[in-house]
Amino acid sequence: MKIPVFLLLLALANAKVFQRCEWARVLKARGMDGYRGISLADWVCLSKWESQYNTNAINHNTDGSTDYGIFQINSRWWCNDDRIPTRNACNIKCSALQTDDVTVAINCAKRVVSDPQGIRAWVAWNRHCQNRDLSAYIAGCGL
């Protein structure tokens, strides 16, 4: 019983909740501003509505799949959580999306938007970011 609690605490210790401008700076430094024509503000908006900038975010879907990490990347298509059949197009374990090192999450997000659906693959972007003024998401960040 003590081991699962330890593992939970270990997972939480490796998670990070970014501040808006901090996250925008990380995304910009990792080449996300303009990647595949997607603005930095779009990425920040998407992350806000998907995870509240939380690398440890998790959401269980009605189809049995799970969304992981700051971008809420889905286990049916993009990562393997050993729970359901997966395409695993990013060729990663889903747990790699839930650490404070966002390299894997960013690389997988780049893979997601390389598909024809692009950023429209994210429901939160469609609902909260598409065709909106997103300037507030990077305002005051000095970018």
UniProtKB/Swiss-Prot annotation:
Q: Which GO terms describe its biological process?
A: defense response to bacterium; killing of cells of another organism
> Which GO-annotated molecular functions does the record name?
lysozyme activity
**Subcellular location per the Swiss-Prot or TrEMBL entry:** Secreted
Q: Which cysteines are joined by disulfide bonds?
A: C21-C141, C45-C129, C79-C94, C90-C108
EC primary class: hydrolase
Q: Which domain of life is it from?
A: Eukaryota
Active site at: E50, D67
Q: Name one GO cellular component term.
A: extracellular region
Could you tell me which Pfam families the record lists for this protein? Lys
The record's EC number reads: 3.2.1.17
User: What Gene3D superfamilies does UniProt report for this protein, alphabetically?
Assistant: 1.10.530.10
Ranges where the C-type lysozyme domain occurs: 16-143
Summarizing the function annotation, the protein's role is: Lysozymes have primarily a bacteriolytic function; those in tissues and body fluids are associated with the monocyte-macrophage system and enhance the activity of immunoagents.
* Miscellaneous comment as given in the Swiss-Prot or TrEMBL entry: Lysozyme C is capable of both hydrolysis and transglycosylation; it also shows a slight esterase activity. It acts rapidly on both peptide-substituted and unsubstituted peptidoglycan, and slowly on chitin oligosaccharides.
Family per record: Belongs to the glycosyl hydrolase 22 family.
Subunit structure, as described in the record: Monomer.
What is this protein's name?
Answer: Lysozyme C
Q: Which organism is it from?
A: Takifugu rubripes (Japanese pufferfish)
